Curated annotation (Swiss-Prot):
<keyword id="KW-0139">CF(1)</keyword>
<keyword id="KW-0066">ATP synthesis</keyword>
<dbReference type="InterPro" id="IPR026015">
    <property type="entry name" value="ATP_synth_OSCP/delta_N_sf"/>
</dbReference>
<keyword id="KW-0406">Ion transport</keyword>
<keyword id="KW-0472">Membrane</keyword>
<protein>
    <recommendedName>
        <fullName>ATP synthase subunit delta</fullName>
    </recommendedName>
</protein>
<keyword id="KW-0813">Transport</keyword>
<keyword id="KW-0375">Hydrogen ion transport</keyword>
<comment type="subunit">
    <text>F-type ATPases have 2 components, F(1) - the catalytic core - and F(0) - the membrane proton channel. F(1) has five subunits: alpha(3), beta(3), gamma(1), delta(1), epsilon(1). F(0) has three main subunits: a(1), b(2) and c(10-14). The alpha and beta chains form an alternating ring which encloses part of the gamma chain. F(1) is attached to F(0) by a central stalk formed by the gamma and epsilon chains, while a peripheral stalk is formed by the delta and b chains.</text>
</comment>
<comment type="function">
    <text>F(1)F(0) ATP synthase produces ATP from ADP in the presence of a proton or sodium gradient. F-type ATPases consist of two structural domains, F(1) containing the extramembraneous catalytic core and F(0) containing the membrane proton channel, linked together by a central stalk and a peripheral stalk. During catalysis, ATP synthesis in the catalytic domain of F(1) is coupled via a rotary mechanism of the central stalk subunits to proton translocation.</text>
</comment>
<dbReference type="GO" id="GO:0045259">
    <property type="term" value="C:proton-transporting ATP synthase complex"/>
</dbReference>
<dbReference type="InterPro" id="IPR020781">
    <property type="entry name" value="ATPase_OSCP/d_CS"/>
</dbReference>
<dbReference type="GO" id="GO:0005886">
    <property type="term" value="C:plasma membrane"/>
</dbReference>
<dbReference type="Pfam" id="PF00213">
    <property type="entry name" value="OSCP"/>
</dbReference>
<keyword id="KW-1003">Cell membrane</keyword>
<dbReference type="InterPro" id="IPR000711">
    <property type="entry name" value="ATPase_OSCP/dsu"/>
</dbReference>
<comment type="similarity">
    <text>Belongs to the ATPase delta chain family.</text>
</comment>
Length: 187
C-alpha cells in the first residue's frame, strides 16, 4: 500500500475517534486537542535525531518503543493520542507519523471549513496586499483561508497560489514562458 494511502487511512480513523469524544473546557473539541498534541509530538520527534533512530529502528521492540513514548509524553497528551501512538507502534507504522499528522490537520481544517493556501511572490507582500489576496481567496473558495507566504525572486513578478491540488499561477515568469511558446509556434 502506498505511504500516502496508509497515512490517510490512519488519519481518518483517528479523526473519527476524536470527533466522537466529549468536548473539553480548554478546547473547542477533542479534534482540536488531538491536532495540537499530534503537532507537538511530531515536532519533538523531528527535532530529536536520537529519538528518531530509536523509534524507527526495526530491531527495537514495540514494547520498548511504547515505553519510551509513554515516559516522554505521560501527562502531556490525551489518552486518545497516547493510544493512537501505541497503535502505530504495534502495527509498525511509526515511520508514517509525520504524514499522518499532515493528513489529520487537513481533515481537521476541512471540518472547520478552512483551506490552506501557499502564496509565493517575487517580492515580499505588504499587509494590505496580503489582506486583499486573502479576501479574494475567501471569495473564490467560500471558505476561511489560512495563508502562508514565501518569496521566490525567479517569478519576476506576480504571485503563485497553491490550495490543495489547485494552482493559480499569476506570475510574470509563466506569462513570459507562455508568450515565448506562442511566438515560437508562429515562426
Amino acid at each position: 500500500m502506498l505511504r500516502g494511502a496508509v497515512a490517510v487511512r490512519y488519519a481518518e480513523a483517528l479523526y473519527e475517534i476524536a470527533s466522537r469524544e466529549k468536548v473539553l473546557p480548554k478546547y473547542k473539541s477533542m479534534v482540536d486537542r488531538v491536532e495540537e498534541e499530534l503537532k507537538a509530538v511530531d515536532k519533538v520527534i523531528r527535532e530529536n535525531s536520537d529519538l528518531q533512530k530509536l523509534l524507527y529502528h526495526p530491531r527495537i521492540t514495540a514494547e520498548e518503543k511504547k515505553d519510551l513514548l509513554q515516559k516522554l509524553f505521560k501527562g502531556k497528551i490525551s489518552d486518545v493520542t497516547a493510544n493512537f501512538l501505541a497503535l502505530l507502534v504495534d502495527r509498525r507504522r511509526e515511520t508514517f507519523f509525520g504524514e499522518i499528522v499532515a493528513e489529520f490537520v487537513k481533515l481537521a481544517n476541512a471540518g472547520r471549513n478552512i483551506i490552506t493556501a501557499q502564496v509565493t511572490s517575487a517580492v515580499e507582500l505588504n499587509d494590505q496586499e496580503k489582506g486583499d489576496l486573502n479576501r479574494i481567496l475567501v471569495r473564490l473558495t467560500g471558505k476561511k483561508v489560512k495563508t502562508s507566504y514565501a518569496v521566490d525572486p525567479s517569478l519576476i513578478g506576480g504571485v503563485v497560489v497553491r490550495m490543495g491540488d489547485k494552482i493559480i499561477d499569476g506570475s510574470l515568469k509563466t506569462r513570459l514562458a507562455s508568450l515565448k511558446e506562442r511566438l515560437l509556434a508562429i515562426s
